[in-house]
Amino acid sequence: MMQESATETISNSSMNQNGMSTLSSQLDAGSRDGRSSGDTSSEVSTVELLHLQQQQALQAARQLLLQQQTSGLKSPKSSDKQRPLQVPVSVAMMTPQVITPQQMQQILQQQVLSPQQLQALLQQQQAVMLQQQQLQEFYKKQQEQLHLQLLQQQQQQQQQQQQQQQQQQQQQQQQQQQQQQQQQQQQQQQHPGKQAKEQQQQQQQQQLAAQQLVFQQQLLQMQQLQQQQHLLSLQRQGLISIPPGQAALPVQSLPQAGLSPAEIQQLWKEVTGVHSMEDNGIKHGGLDLTTNNSSSTTSSTTSKASPPITHHSIVNGQSSVLNARRDSSSHEETGASHTLYGHGVCKWPGCESICEDFGQFLKHLNNEHALDDRSTAQCRVQMQVVQQLEIQLSKERERLQAMMTHLHMRPSEPKPSPKPLNLVSSVTMSKNMLETSPQSLPQTPTTPTAPVTPITQGPSVITPASVPNVGAIRRRHSDKYNIPMSSEIAPNYEFYKNADVRPPFTYATLIRQAIMESSDRQLTLNEIYSWFTRTFAYFRRNAATWKNAVRHNLSLHKCFVRVENVKGAVWTVDEVEYQKRRSQKITGSPTLVKNIPTSLGYGAALNASLQAALAESSLPLLSNPGLINNASSGLLQAVHEDLNGSLDHIDSNGNSSPGCSPQPHIHSIHVKEEPVIAEDEDCPMSLVTTANHSPELEDDREIEEEPLSEDLE
């Protein structure tokens, strides 16, 4: 029965478990050896021993399976990872099962195995245990080696990555270094050029600094010369009286060296500002001498004063005005004013920047107009302009002085005049005389030297003592036509071409000059127009006005002949007719001027035509009898006799009184007889200022310039 049960258990165990055949075969082999070795062994003991061993192996296998299942449920990931390293089931089933003492006693009591068999079994179990331990150690070593290999591979990969990164960084650094080297090479290649440029710039700056120093010295020298010339000119004209020792004081006060560029510019601007103020004072005061000192001139006429005394009194009065203006200008200069700053605008040439206040202007001046190449060039241009204007001014001053000296000489050959003068002709001649001197001068407000304004050396108020001078002016003005116009224009050609100044010639004279300058002595109307605009800057504006006047003069005067030729209609000059009409005497017009006796009602006695002419000539004084008093009756009588041409010579002492008048002398005055045209809107300054005792007439001291006359005279 026991054998059958053992066989059944073995068969069941073989059917239920895999891999037990090897174990059973080993046990069978061991049992065979035991049977062969032991004589007392039996079949029942061997079978029981096998049964026990199989049970132990099954239990051990079950325990291992349970442990694997529990460990798989707890950590399936770790089990999956460690599957290739797990011990096979066959080996796990061979795990030794320790035989308890009770089991040993049962085996001994039942006498299943002999002691020798038990020893052999125990030895086998120990051997199996050793094998299992060796296997476990082997598998552990393999696992450790695998772990180490994995770690080494990971480390190698990391090292490779790091090496790659380092290589990339090294490559980038090498590229950057190469780029830097290339840039340095390029810079080194360009560096010699830069050094040369820097050296050139330094040399240029040094040259500019030297030029600026020379230029500053030239400016100081020019300023000194200009001040000396200005003082000398004023001293010559009698405007100021300076002792010889004091003439050099302003020049000596100028510093010679140690000035900064800003101080030199400030000095230049201050001096030019003072000169411009003085120039304006002389310009505005030159023609207003009689109005500023009307009381002194009136008293001089009643007290039988001579013209030179009156002249000196006027000049002395004017010098006081100039001194006052000079003092006021110096106060303005010290009061934070500036020549280059006015009305919130910078007056530097070509700048015109808007500055809100004086501080902003100073910042603008120091920043934009510092001592550099551009400012130096602009200053040089201004110096050239000033030099040209000074040359022109000196020429004009000499010419004016000669004219004044010449015109105020006493007449030597009085000529009789059978008929009274034409009033319009005398007024025209006086006006033309005044136009030839002051209005032909260039107006140069920017020049540091003051232009000399013409100052009449005789009294402006017409007195019996001044009537011979007026006669001389009339005669000299009529003789002027014997002088060729080319000699008048040639020296001032550039001035008239560039300056907007009216030429002191009639349209007929200008037309004749244009025709005479042409190659074939004939011009078309358009060619005459082009000559006017080309020669005079004054005719480049108001074309409609003066072109009408040119056409009117061409058709009016017989000396201009219209000829038809291939070009069309051209104009020529008949010189015989031109000279004949100039030398022709005026016959007079009795209806225009009547012989009116001297009385207090002189203004009321003027006829309608005379009053109309005076009204057109802006002379309300003579047409208003209320302004005439007893003190000026002799003066008005002299004016009346001069306008009628009955006076050309009076006693050299100038004896005159309100009660008596000198004997009229008959003279022959060469004046062109022409119809009255709208030329007489201007009038001589001497007539404007007659009997000027009222301040209401001070606004009429400067009369606006009108277009040129449309007649010959």
From Swiss-Prot:
UniProt feature, compositional bias: Basic and acidic residues: 324-335
Quaternary structure and partners: Forms homodimers and heterodimers with FOXP1 and FOXP4. Dimerization is required for DNA-binding. Interacts with CTBP1. Interacts with FOXP1. Interacts with TBR1. Interacts with ZMYM2.
GO MF term (any one): zinc ion binding
Chief site of localization: nucleus
Lineage: Eukaryota, Metazoa, Chordata, Craniata, Vertebrata
Protein name, per record: Forkhead box protein P2
Disulfide bridge positions per record: none
Function of the protein: Transcriptional repressor that may play a role in the specification and differentiation of lung epithelium. May also play a role in developing neural, gastrointestinal and cardiovascular tissues. Can act with CTBP1 to synergistically repress transcription but CTPBP1 is not essential. Plays a role in synapse formation by regulating SRPX2 levels.
Biased composition (Polar residues): 1-28, 313-322
DNA-binding region: 502-592
C2H2-type zinc finger span: 344-369
